[in-house]
Amino acid sequence: MRKNVKKQLALRVLSTAALVAMVSSIATAAFAAEYNVAEGSVEIVAKDGSQSITQWADKDKGTFVKDENGDNIDHRPDSKIVLVTKDETTGETKPTSNTVTITAENENDTANVTLKNVDIRVDTAEAKSGAIEIKGDGNTNLELNGDNTVLVKNDWKEEHAAIEKADKYGKGTLTIKDDLNDDGTPKDKDENGNAAGGDTGKLLAGGFHQAAAIGGGG
């Protein structure tokens, strides 16, 4: 009888441990990691069915931005990348001149990136690129959360779009959308299956003197 009690107790402990592990796993999956572009330029690569991010503290010196655990953000696998330029102390969105490069390597690869209240302003004479470069032969999806500003100041020797998708960088596609609420939850769909209602993501993109506004749906 005592053996049966011990077995039942052991099973209960094991079941509880398994439940805690499942809850922990679900909680981890629910929150997408945020990367502050103000801390360093970002390179995102989607290849062979996976997506990774590298963030440079100083690319010329080969140094990386570190996360809260002190680990380098270097080719880190992440399927739900969220980019911000928020000051973590004040919560204020700050402008940065750091750049973002997103590469969906091959035709069947897809990069999924969320812009969440980013403010990126780049001088092309210094950056030699646009603020956000889209490259590769695959598909890139940009989700808009909150108010986003992406601008370039063009030098006549270095002219680039704020969000640049050029054939010389690959034949892939770029889709800018607003399918999620600002908290990352899916929006309701209308009769045509398009996102409707909820929070509306916004994007101001263009040159300093000639800007074009692109609003999210809903």
Task: For the regions a language model picked out, list residue spans one by one.
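A composition-driven surface/loop motif
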Residues: R12-T16, A27-G218
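Bacterial Sec-dependent N-terminal signal peptides
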Residues: M1-A17
